[in-house]
Amino acid sequence: MTHTYPREAAKPVLGPARYDVWAPNAESVTLLAGGERYAMQRRAETGPEDAGWWTAAGAPTDGNVDYGYLLDGDETPLPDPRTRRQPDGVHALSRTFDPSAYSWQDDAWQGRELQGAVIYELHLGTFTPEGTLEAAAGKLDYLAGLGVDFIELLPVNAFNGTHNWGYDGVQWFAVHEAYGGPEAYQRFVDAAHAAGLGVIQDVVYNHLGPSGNYLPRFGPYLKQGEGNTWGDSVNLDGPGSDHVRRYILDNLAMWLRDYRVDGLRLDAVHALKDERAVHILEDFGALADQISAEVGRPLTLIAESDLNNPRLLYPRDVNGYGLEGQWSDDFHHAVHVNVTGETTGYYSDFDSLAALAKVLRDGFFHDGSYSSFRERHHGRPINFSAVHPAALVVCSQNHDQIGNRATGDRLSQTLPYGSLALAAVLTLTGPFTPMLLMGEEYGASTPWQFFTSHPEPELGKATAEGRIKEFERMGWDPAVVPDPQDPETFRRSKLDWAEAAEGDHARLLELYRSLTALRRSTPDLTKLGFEDTQVAFDEDARWLRFRRGGVQVLLNFSEQPVSLDGAGTALLLATDDAVRLEGERAELGPLSAAVVSD
């Protein structure tokens, strides 16, 4: 199936089509633009793609125009479903924005492949004291020096309130004004490319936030009464869904074309309920490939999925979806259990080095095996001939796994340097694509907590209660869970950059820099396939080792020293001074790791 995009995403910069709107539910639509009213007419239908569209004549086309829509005589103007700017909030008028006006300086940027890369996940509001795109741009040289290749931004689309994780967005085409708005976003991507960094934008297509969502007033964007964890499901396969899918695909095209991002992280794709013969994820992959060919650089789509289904990664010509990557939560769980000892909730199946060994070899732990947390079998095996290990994006910490702890405590708030070093070595030398959570690299002491700023008190209360209910199986004590609506919860989550130069923080930061440098200089760590990973371990002595080509990674999870034979002749990296390589015997101190070569 071949599609040519974008459609409405390419609204002319000038002319009345800028204000065209899909409102099949309306009997009449009036455009309010620049303080004047313009009666809109139904678009002449040449095919089903025109059904439900309205157009206006004579509306202003120059400058920044504030505008909205009056439906069926209602005197309250609604923002544009495709609004590019909401300077006064999600309930106010939209403002026109011309993305082609920006003068890009990144013509030399050739893009970046996922294989061999390191991703750095950050939230704009808490990454810097200012919480803006401009302030984040001031840290690009630091990130380049850290050795990362992609910056992955948590969602930036417009939401109600001042601060939020970003998953309550309601205007998918608009960049949140508190971050700087759409032009600031263009400047940030331009600056990132100048620093040699790609940008991956986290996007949410499975639900909309609870405040400021006017899409149902215009058309059947949602499946009323058919929901997921976060609200009504998006209408991907019901009546009118051709236009809804078009809306989403045009949004995907906007990020890749107008903002020149290098990839998208697709939030919770298991919640995209689509019974069509061609799943929308397949359309995503086809569109991204089309745009990649147009712009002449690689573009990457990474799915967050808890299905453990490698079909996401298989080529479309063999009935796959053709995405470049997907998250592997199993890797996180196996690492987490083995450095913390926690086995509650969904960690219960990962309470052994055997689980970690299986993940390193096979990519998934649950590949058709029984999941005690789900109380059913889960996942399917990966076809090693069809998928490279780099297609699995892994981490020891991320915004979900830390933020969805009762108090949002990072590993660095409870674990010693040695345990943090073990997690770092596993993540950055394993077969997969590593992703770091902002501040992880220096062992940030600040938590990453769940925060909201809903102006409506009832929404704030419902959010706090719903969150505790969602994670009741993790054994949370409600008394210690921070109030998401308390401004202090947000402020506590901001990084303290001063500590990165102090004590074990600085020591850990240097280890991360050494690990990213080692990845770049050691092809065996990044280029080999699944079948090239060999793993051995001793459950009682608590050591594990794995080989990739001519490189071995040795890890001691115990509080006692360990000696390992057959360790090679060259020490490439050690997590502390207690590590020794004598002949081909490695001496590892407690909670330490080494990378050696033959």
From Swiss-Prot:
Catalytic reaction list: hydrolysis of (1->4)-alpha-D-glucosidic linkage in 4-alpha-D-[(1->4)-alpha-D-glucanosyl]n trehalose to yield trehalose and (1->4)-alpha-D-glucan
Entry annotation: catalytic residues: 267, 304
EC number: 3.2.1.141
Residue numbers marked as site, Transition state stabilizer: 400
GO-annotated biological processes: trehalose biosynthetic process
Keyword Cytoplasm tagged: yes
A family per Pfam: DUF3459
Pathway(s) annotated for this protein in UniProt: Glycan biosynthesis; trehalose biosynthesis
Keyword Hydrolase assigned: yes
Subcellular location: Cytoplasm
GO molecular function terms listed in the Swiss-Prot or TrEMBL record: 4-alpha-D-(1->4)-alpha-D-glucanotrehalose trehalohydrolase activity
GO cellular component labels: cytoplasm
UniProt entry keywords in alphabetical sequence: Carbohydrate metabolism, Cytoplasm, Glycosidase, Hydrolase
Domain of life: Bacteria
Binding-site residues, substrate: 265-270, 329-333, 399-404
Similarity comment: Belongs to the glycosyl hydrolase 13 family.
Protein name: Malto-oligosyltrehalose trehalohydrolase
Lineage, highest ranks first: Bacteria, Bacillati, Actinomycetota, Actinomycetes, Micrococcales
Gene that produces this protein: treZ
